[in-house]
Amino acid sequence: MREIVHVQGGQCGNQIGAKFWEVISDEHGIAPTGTYKGDSDLQLERISVFYNEATGGRYVPRAVLMDLEPGTMDSVRSGPFGQLFRPDNFVFGQTGAGNNWAKGHYTEGAELIDSVLDVVRKEAEGCDCLQGFQVTHSLGGGTGSGMGTLLISKVREEYPDRIMETFSVFPSPKVSDTVVEPYNATLSVHQLVENADEVQVIDNEALYDICFRTLKLTTPTYGDLNHLVSAAMSGVTCSLRFPGQLNSDLRKLAVNLVPFPRLHFFLIGFAPLTSRGSQQYRALTVPELTQQMFDAKNMMCASDPRHGRYLTACALFRGRMSTKEVDEQMLNVQNKNSSYFVEWIPNNMKSGVCDIPPKGLKMSVTFVGNSTAIQEMFKRVSDQFTAMFRRKAFLHWYTGEGMDEMEFTEAESNMNDLVSEYQQYQDATAEEEGEFDEEEGVMDAEGAA
């Protein structure tokens, strides 16, 4: 079967990861003790994608948990599903990375990385046909960003032909946890551009907005935010785990969504999202889901798809529905909003249909879009980066761990290149192919920016 090895790193990654395992254990009928308590054969049919069956019918997640301090791990271990994980798969240091990317990537993290890779290798060897890896981490801190990207590049070296998918929490526009977020995030993006196949971009502020606006929660907690993310994570891998009429997997997703190798940063959304009170006033239909899924307020990261154009997009539906209706809706969206899709990739919507809806819903849809609007995200981080880097603020924390200023300059220009690439394809049209000169295009894009 097509197994996926899940790696979570740092505080944010471990908290999202823990929530994700709660969600899919619930879907597959796995109790917190690891025993099967479900009621349908479908739950077990492809359970091996995320779980390994141990002796006595116990199901163990193919998960590797890493952190540079024991705190978050302890709370995962004592959390509701803490007994699910294999104790050897908790790999942690004692020092912490102190929000310092260099500590995570070069010093503290580098000391721990071999023991993490041993566990990853062990999990990968336990698979019949490994499909790929999914990593949850944040880019603002030290461990998830520094050590997370170190792990990604090491795994890339060892398994070059497997898909590497990450769920990366970017720094939010207004809410900042750390002053040095722009540094950490820029250095991480520099790595993700080269070593990941698909990056789902998430940020806390957009998640808070969804909780306030759509779910009408007055005081959303990180638990609520992580629940949103894990709903989307579960949707992306759903068709690997349950039978469906139109299957998709990580590789199909990558092939359909990545038109140019560097542009693999995706917006994700999930529908239906309704507040508790108004659920019974809405019918769940394919048109209704399609409408909500394309709503800018539904995106889990703070860039507005209306400010750019979709290169490609993908809708993964779950539940009993007619595939014909799904196809019609997809076509309908593209025709009505044709200006928001680039015209030089015809039919750039992929859809998948999986028969089993998530717990408590009749049908749902997960949306993954490759939009040029994501450049807003990078531009914002890049501006903050430049403001600090020009004054060399906080730089001694990084150079003290052996980093070179050159690396910062490289990461900065890589990020700016990424922004102008997105801009170039946003402006490109189907006709001008002949006279379109590469260099000229990039210059124009920078002028426009």
UniProtKB/Swiss-Prot annotation:
InterPro entries named in the record: Beta-tubulin_BS, Beta_tubulin, Tub_FtsZ_C, Tubulin, Tubulin/FtsZ-like_C, Tubulin/FtsZ_2-layer-sand-dom, Tubulin/FtsZ_GTPase_sf, Tubulin_C
Binding positions (Mg(2+)): 69
KW Nucleotide-binding (keyword) present: yes
One Pfam family, short name: Tubulin_C
Keywords from the UniProt entry: Cytoplasm, Cytoskeleton, GTP-binding, Magnesium, Metal-binding, Microtubule, Nucleotide-binding
GO molecular function, one term: metal ion binding
Binding-site residues, GTP: 11, 69, 138, 142-144, 204, 226
Subcellular location: Cytoplasm, Cytoskeleton
Chief place where the protein resides: cytoplasm
Region (Disordered): 426-449
Cofactor(s) needed by this chain: Mg(2+)
Top-level taxon in the UniProt lineage: Eukaryota
GO BP term (any one): microtubule-based process
GO cellular component: cytoplasm; microtubule
Record's function text: Tubulin is the major constituent of microtubules, a cylinder consisting of laterally associated linear protofilaments composed of alpha- and beta-tubulin heterodimers. Microtubules grow by the addition of GTP-tubulin dimers to the microtubule end, where a stabilizing cap forms. Below the cap, tubulin dimers are in GDP-bound state, owing to GTPase activity of alpha-tubulin.
Family membership: Belongs to the tubulin family.
Protein name as it appears in the record: Tubulin beta chain
